[in-house]
Amino acid sequence: RGIWHTAEKFRAAGRGSVSVAELVNELTRYFEDKKSFAEWDTPENQLADTLPAISRSNAWVAILNEMVNARRGTSLVSMGVLSFEYRKNDEAVLGFQDAFGLEQGDARALLELLAQDAVYSGAIDAGKDYTLTSAEREYIFFAPTAKKLVLLKTAENAKKSWISGWRGRKRTNGNYYPNSRMSRLMRALGLSEDDADALLCDYWENVFEAETEEFSLDANDFRINIGGLPSSKFYRCKKCGRITPYNVKNQCSSVKCSGVLETYDPLSASEGNHYARLYRSDRADPLYIKEHTAQLAKDQQTAYQEAFVQKKINAL
């Protein structure tokens, strides 16, 4: 909801693209203004000391959660509110376009889909700007351990669920294990498995420029494109209905689907959508609920009752 309203503000100002840091800053201010994460028993004169940090941490959690879950049908990307673009792809587009005879838009979209595959694995963080707690990682990634990418996932680390491999991995018989990035490159460029695997290695070395064996993306290396403006484009698969801002030769962004893309305006189409109505709502005030049982100490019961009468607590 906060990101929706923040994107609306940028849209109204005609801002087609903003940095992740700028969106985090604006979202932090939104949470502060709404006191969305203020504790019910924090004195008014102490809010200025605690609210900015709490609001900023929740802004980062919201952004990272949206990035990792962008494929969901209820995501802000699927509703055309915004999309994500990896800035490190900027310098690779021209060479990629020339090497494979692609249109510039196709080249960019294919590179973006590769970067997004890394994001969807959960190997992303806020870099030096913020460190997620284990509880926050559990909320976003369903695991308390930070997820990482390695160039090749071997049999030795196969049981490490927090590690994802990037390039293709071969079975003992010489055949490759399924790899969605290889499949994507083979379909879009007509490459063999070995050539697709070599291209993934090249991307790892020259775009990710990973300096350590275990690697995670920095969310600050992305820009956010604001939807609903002439510069934003979205597409929908005629077969499966998936919505994407990435169009490679009109192929569905899902490697499991053979559908064809068509131009689509998800932001306008979401007017009657249940989730869109929730996101558009301006109600971002905190809801305080406390358990009121006989097991509580008498002074605690009294404190809750008084707070409820004073409307500091919404429900007992």
Task: Spell out what each predicted region is.
Residues 1-312:
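Helicase motor interdomain insertion/brace
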Residues 315-316:
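SF2 helicase motor core recognition
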